Amino acid sequence: MTRTDTRSYPFGDPVALDLHPGYAPLRAEQPALRVRLPYGEDCWLVTRHEDVKAVLSDSRFSRARAAGREETPRVTPEAAPAGSMLSMDPPEHSRLRKLIARAFTSRRVREFRPRTQEIVDGLLDQVEQAGAPADLVAGLALPLPVSVISQMLGVPTEDHYRFRDFSATVLSTTAHTREEIVAARAALEEYLGELADQRRREPGEDLMSALVAAHDDDRLTDRELTQTGITLLVGGHESTASQFACSVYLLLERPERWALLRDNPELVPTAVEELLRFIPLGSGGAFARIATEDVEVGGVLVRAGEAVVASTNSANRDDRVFTDPDVLDLAREHNPHLAFGGGVHVCLGAQLARGELQVALTSLLTRFPGLRLAVPPEQVPWRQGSLLRSPVELPVTW
């Protein structure tokens, strides 16, 4: 394929939670093709589950070589910064991940679950007391993960407002200018530096105190400390908030879906996995990888130095892996979705996110069994110009 017939990517502006129909014929006929993103050089796009999983898991595709390069293909005005765990390869990535992983073990997540339940109950008390109609984004979807990750990091409650708007800005594709994104990231770095100083003076059992101790033992650089803090703070709430809001929207858009879970609450863990598979949460092209040597993938030879974007959204709708992939089957049993990525960069907080989603959904079903949208589905406003899809507001009644 020549440069003149390289396709533009992403494939048009999304409508609510629709997945662009262009992925299906690509998976069938051209599983790897050349695309041009809004910024950077042309790259390869892979769309089949098998190939996406391979790219995510193969060490010959480097995140580190893609970081901080203006030439790296991307959908954001500002290139992903170096020094973040998201933009490292082993062994640097392994060293940093090991420092953080102990806070996200299955045991620690299980131990935190009662606290998650307390947070959810308190938020739903406020929603119920305020009365219908209510905005479920402002009332539950956003404050829940903000509270959870803040408590894990040791962020004081009164500081939540300081990072919320900045974190939304750094995830911008078209909603903010490059200058605004750079300023927002600088503000987050300044705040994380202040928080680190505070934890150095008053250490606790939180994750930021542990990171500060590692920094002071020369196991973490200044930049790694702040960038890791930003990754945890932003990644720890934005994706979970968006996923929960999108999940409730889909359940209420078709009331029989809500009724199924209300009458069969034991299905909630299975339903959460299916919603993770079905919802195309992230924007295509968020994280490109650079081939460090020639690699064959999707029937093409990716040359050393060329970039690859792996579409997990497309992979999660691959009919080679999933029966009726475009059907939201809340009782689906075989579900090897890639919503949390794969390989060494698989989402560190996957178990934490699952726990939050399960607790919040179960509590919502129990507290408000008659929950329904307060406006027609087509009137729900959607976030625009961001790496993540989600309702801006989710008006509900009961």
UniProtKB/Swiss-Prot annotation:
It catalyses: nocardicin C + 4 reduced [2Fe-2S]-[ferredoxin] + 2 O2 + 2 H(+) = nocardicin A + 4 oxidized [2Fe-2S]-[ferredoxin] + 3 H2O. It is an enzyme of class 1 (oxidoreductase). Disruption phenotype: Disruption of the gene abolishes nocardicin A production, and the mutant accumulates the biosynthetic intermediate nocardicin C. Pathway: Antibiotic biosynthesis. Its EC number is 1.14.15.43. Signal peptide: none annotated. GO terms for biological process: antibiotic biosynthetic process. Keywords: Antibiotic biosynthesis, Heme, Iron, Metal-binding, Monooxygenase, Oxidoreductase. Its cofactor is heme. InterPro entries: Cyt_P450 (IPR001128), Cyt_P450_B (IPR002397), Cyt_P450_CS (IPR017972), Cyt_P450_sf (IPR036396). It comes from the Bacteria. GO terms for molecular function: heme binding; iron ion binding; monooxygenase activity; oxidoreductase activity, acting on paired donors, with incorporation or reduction of molecular oxygen. Residues 63-90 are annotated as: Disordered. Heme binds at residues 93, 97, 289, 345, 347. Involved in the biosynthesis of the beta-lactam antibiotic nocardicin A. Catalyzes the conversion of nocardicin C to nocardicin A. Cannot use nocardicin G. Belongs to the cytochrome P450 family. PANTHER family: CYTOCHROME P450 YJIB-RELATED (PTHR46696:SF1), P450, PUTATIVE (EUROFUNG)-RELATED (PTHR46696). This is Nocardicin C N-oxygenase. It comes from Nocardia uniformis subsp. tsuyamanensis. The gene is nocL.
